[in-house]
Amino acid sequence: MNCYFEEGETFTWIRDRDRKDKNLIISLRMLKEKHRSGNKQAMIAEDIRTGKKYFVKVLFCTDLEQVYVEKESKVQLYSPYVIRIYGGILDEKKRRFITLVEYIEENDLSDLVRTHGLAGSTWNEKMKVCHTIALKILYGIDHYMSMYWQDPIVHRDLKPENILASPDGETVKIIDFDWVHLHDSNVTVMLRREQKGTPGYADPRYWNSYICRKEMDIYSAGLVLYFLYTGRHHFYGNEELQRYMVGDDYAYELKDMPGIDEPLKRIIAKMIAREEERYGDIREVIADMEAYLKEIGRMPKLPELLREENTRDTIRFSYKVGDVKYSPYVKNYRFIPIEFGRKQERSQNGRMSGHILSFYRVGDEMRSVILQEDCHKIKEKERGRVREGDIYSYAGTEIEVLQIKKVR
């Protein structure tokens, strides 16, 4: 019998069970149940001390080890267009895995487009919002895919219901990484041979296979953009879905989009084409979308965007975690994740887990974003920038920046 949370119930969230520091413990009060079915539950909760709200996802499963390996709690990265996932803990006694997620008070794209409506009183105003939302979705995909160059993260369930957006397009967040393929994980490929994604949005070629490729998300994103610009699902009704599942030409041909410019249609058509004719990289999609929007004078300004123009220069970024030194090369926009409890961590401060800090490049500068609230910058040469000699501290381990050198 599953032990569901009830409204009003309290729960103590411990980020690291090996340490009992006060700032690692959050006392949560369950405010409202959002979903309950079978082995899943979703709640809105608040920090009793600060009042900060969180979204709590609960998964009940007999195979606790598999849940711990696979859960979306491992997808911890900073992006203005990807939901913040704070981490997950395993409640062995009640056989449930609990994931703490950023809480956003916005509708999903399906509800927004079909029920509440986009901001704007004219067609052009609504198209402006559509362009902004579309770009942010594409940038969000680029952000999680660019986390690792080899074997990138793949969402595998992109659809309108898994994107939160405000009516004006100011807020856009990709959510629900339940089906995610994690970097360097055979588990998410081999043990999840069952269907991946949602009928009508997942590439039918990979519907029931061991293969996991980033082109899967490009296909799904194309169908999401079709919905955004038309207000209709590309494949609708049992008959169309059955034809789509066959995986023949019908699944890869764009339907008509009345009122939409031909260049934009061509972009979306190439996103959902057969893989050999499809975009091979999300940045190719972004480049074509940006070129189209600049051509028509509709390129939105996104001040929070952490992406720069391509450059031939590379930055050699050296740092050490504890006594172990790392020297990755950083070109253009790329995250350097600092993780504990995985291959990278070699300190002797006990068992720790999670992605606690990211470094990234903007132009010729390196910057950082702290993802765990108990990670602190204890030595800083210049506020808001990363400089040689800067030191971060987490669980008694220091992360020191050794070198930032521009090379060609």
Predicted regions and their residues:
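Short beta-strand micro-motifs within the conserved protein kinase catalytic domain, predominantly
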Residues: 84-97
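Conserved activation segment of eukaryotic-like protein kinases, specifically the C-terminal portion
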Residues: 190-206
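ATP-binding glycine-rich loop module of kinase domains
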Residues: 38-67
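Forkhead-associated
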Residues: 327-398, 403
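Conserved short submotifs of the Hanks-type protein kinase catalytic core
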Residues: 94-108, 112
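Catalytic-loop of the protein kinase fold
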Residues: 145-166
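Conserved end of the kinase activation segment
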Residues: 205-215
